[in-house]
Swiss-Prot record:
HAMAP family: TruB_arch. Residues 209-285 form the PUA domain. Belongs to the pseudouridine synthase TruB family. Type 2 subfamily. Residues 300-365 are annotated as: Disordered. Pfam families: PUA, TruB_C_2, TruB_N. The gene is truB. Its EC number is 5.4.99.25. It comes from Thermoplasma acidophilum (strain ATCC 25905 / DSM 1728 / JCM 9062 / NBRC 15155 / AMRC-C165). Keywords: Isomerase, tRNA processing. This is Probable tRNA pseudouridine synthase B. One of its GO terms (molecular function) is RNA binding.
Amino acid sequence: MDFSNINGFVVLDKPQGPTSHQVDHWVREILGIEKVAHIGTLDPNVTGVLTMAIGKAVRLVDVVHESPKEYVGVMRFYEDITEEEVRYYFKKFTGRIYQLPPVRSAVARSLRIKTVYSLDLLEKKDRLVLFHVKCESGTYIRTLCTDIGYVSGKGGQMVDLRRTSTGPFSEDRCITLQDFAAMVELARKGEDKLLRDHILDMTYAFKDYPKIVVKRSAMRNIAHGSDLYAGGIKIIDGKFRKGERVAVISEDNDLVGTGIAMCSSDNIFMKVVDFDHIFLEADDGKDNVVRIGKEAVQKSGSGLHKDIQRSEGRKDTRTGWYGRDTGPEKTADRVWKGKNKGRVYPRSGADKGGGGKERHGRDHQ
């Protein structure tokens, strides 16, 4: 199995101790490739879902990182507190909240607004509380626990934390780093079925997103950088509104790209998707030609055509060539560019009797 051709995700169960970047390094060493990155950094003492992007999937790290995260954690209150009080303060911290990142964080310490979608009490024993939280990406759970303790008047802190999902990647897909290394070793010996079963393709990242299936006729234009227009759509799977992210896939269910919807699914017109990621490979040089009318006069990689000896531009009205316009046939003066830009000098050979202005600066350049 050629590991350099892997383009997808593997969900690892990060243990306590190593940093997320250390896990990146180990996966690179195991596979022998460089294109590896994790989605959503975990602190060294936090365990759970650490999704690794491999190959082309590395380009989707920022997209998947936008997805909500889920955690199970343990919080300790400094004073006695009842279950009813815990539920009350958990409800207070559900919805949009203000957060100040901790002192030891990778981002600037400025007040931010984050969304907590749900915060549930699972179990309570004495001053210890087991909870489940689903929150917006970038929410600090340690800070959340500290803030709850402060507002309750009891004081408190996070004791333990485990991430259970990042977007569509959940812990039921997790494998340990040791298991992953063993699967790779088997794949090197030709037994790659187990490894293939645990590598999720790039479309899996958009399992919960609305999707647009494009016509084959539109694929070439997209590969060359075009956005998606209404005429290139074959099927729309799911509802979306203007400004939401959508996934664009081929008729063969391969990921073509992803971008922001420029209209709603109920009112399709003109430009539909503004791509920020395209995964199609363009045919190098194909259709990249210089034309006069409908006739191709310069194909990529071939010798220079006699009619395009100069830079591209408008048709020269004197010569009939397509190139930069040389201007009128007789011009008394010309403007020199560069450091003497703006000064007007006579053409060379004009008025050699000394009646013209003296030239400066660029005579010998």
